Amino acid sequence: MVLGRFYFKQTANGNLLGEFSNTGMGLNKTESADIISRFNIPFIGTYRSTWFQQTAQSLNLEIQFKIDSNDRIYSLTWTNNNNVAFLAEGFIVDDILIGDYRDEELQRFIENQF
């Protein structure tokens, strides 16, 4: 099970640059995401996300407003061939999207507890 935290800054072109760490790491690593959908609303869209942990990783990233929220809480989903790898929630502080993320295994565990 993986539990982590992240932040993303958005470039003028709509791409994302940031850092993350999780329970299996002792340091922060970089992550970038190239926007592949039309850039209309800050942070909202579909991206191709890339980072290095032990090896290079690349997944699709979908960011949208969390359902039943005030459009100030964001829902993030990283997928590989439509299989969910990581889920996250975050919010904006000083134009930076910050939040927590977890893998699908931890998400199922949490859902079974409540």
Predicted segments, located by residue:
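Central antiparallel beta-sheet cores of small beta-barrel/beta-sandwich binding domains
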Residues: 1-114
